[in-house]
Amino acid sequence: MKSIGDNLKLFRLRCNLSLTDAGSKVGFSAPGLLKYERNKVNHSLDKLNKLADIYNVTLDDILRVDDTASIKFTNLRVGTSVSEAKIEKIKSLIQNKVDNYFELLNKSNIKLVNKFGVHIINTVNEAESLATKLRIFFQIPINEPIYNLIYLLEQHDIIVLTLDKSSVTEGFIGFYENINNIPVIIVPKEDDGYSQRFNVAKFLGELLIISNESNKSNLTDTFALSLLVPTKSLINEFGENRKKINFEEIDIFSKVYRVSYKNIIKKLEISNIITSSNAKYLNIYINKENKKEQYFMEEALNYNKMLYKLNALDIISDVSSYL
């Protein structure tokens, strides 16, 4: 169960306030507020109301102590320079987001089912084969693009969430875990929809693949690329062996398949459609000419869809505490 203290800590971290800063606003020392957050003392309604004002939430938000999901956080990915204090803040944001999602599912009377399981994968060919099998499961032909990956995963009971960019989430790369036996993927909101889309595909691979190999990351990269850009689709578009490829061909393929220029070139090289020197030349040209992909962005929609429907049905009166 979540506690009042857990909520106080979460809301303080959301506001990016230290114990000293928050405590000084209500006449608490840092140790005094820490006792409140650790539920070591009885909570005064007067103090809780003042803290609610500081944190820009309601008293009901602070008093809401529904069940909390058990999260291991073993697959939290952050940059090497991210401090332990910031990691704890990111964990609190993830915990709150996941708890809210499962609460919305419960209030909506929706039951998710894990349809995927795990797969023992030890070679690049096996990783590519798994991506092909998943496309068959999704009923997407091997030579057609996946137009909206996040929507597709949400339609198959995978929870996908995003964290807004802020000083708190700076350095957050992503998170993936089976929670309550449901696959959960969380990524930062990106300016670039291409890297976000690739990371969602890669983290899906991390959830599905069990490997004896030390370089599992290489297998999940292969899985992600193969899911988004099957080798057959490349051969259909570019042919089996090319001495030269114009950048405009790459650009057109990127617009259709929504994959970055560099990942298309990487896949062309891996598939032996172009040589390493051709790949190097194309990448140099893209960097030199500062070529940019056509803008697009995918959004996770199920969370807000449930939230605003429950609000319209008067089951949830205040949506702000869930945002």
Which residue ranges define each predicted feature?
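Active-site hotspot residues in diverse enzymes, especially metal/ion-binding acidic/histidine motifs
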Residues: 1-323
